[in-house]
C-alpha cells in the first residue's frame, strides 16, 4: 500500500544538528523579527527597504531550511559564500538605514524619528544580529570551500551492500 503525506517524505533529521542549519535557523528568526517589527512604519522609505529585504531573506531562509530537511544536495560552497557575503552586505545597509533614520531629527532639532518608539530600534538590533548570522554562514561556507571534505566522507548510498569493497574474495 503506498504511503501518502508526511510519512512519504524522507526527512534528513541529521541536518538539524549541523552548524549551518542552526545558523540558518537563527538567520530565519532574525529576519522574521526584523521585518515584522518594522512593518507598521511605512511612512519612511528607508523602513520600506528594511521590510522588503527582511521578507525576501526570510522567504529564502525558509526555502533553504526545507531544502536541507528534504535531503537536497549541498550547494557549491563558493556559491553559498558569495550569496552570504551579498546578503550580509544588504543586511549592513538595512542596519545603517534603520539606525540613521531613527536618529534623524524631524521638526524640532530635539525630536527624533523614533523618539519613544522601540520597534524600529529593535528592528535595527535584529538587523545587526542578521548581519552576524550572515557573517557566520559566510565563514562556514568559506571553510568548506577552502578545506573540502574527502570523498570518503560522503554517504553515497544507504544500501550496505553498495559499501562493500570493489574486489571480492568470491570466485
From Swiss-Prot:
The question of whether Transmembrane is a record keyword is answered with yes
Q: Where in the cell is it found?
A: Cell membrane
Q: Which ranges of this chain reside in the Cytoplasmic compartment per its record?
A: 1-22, 70-77, 143-171
Key word Ribonucleoprotein present? no
Q: Where are the transmembrane segments?
A: 23-42, 49-69, 78-98, 122-142
**Main localization, broad class:** membrane
The protein's topology relative to the membrane is: Multi-pass membrane protein
UniProt keyword annotations, A-Z: Cell membrane, Membrane, Transmembrane, Transmembrane helix
Q: Which GO terms describe its cellular component?
A: plasma membrane
Q: Which residues lie on this side of the membrane: Extracellular?
A: 43-48, 99-121
Specify the domain of life of the species encoding this protein: Eukaryota
Subunit relationships? Homodimer and heterodimers.
Q: So what family is this one in?
A: Belongs to the Casparian strip membrane proteins (CASP) family.
Name of the protein described by the UniProt record: CASP-like protein 0U2
Organism, by scientific name, is: Chlorokybus atmophyticus (Soil alga)
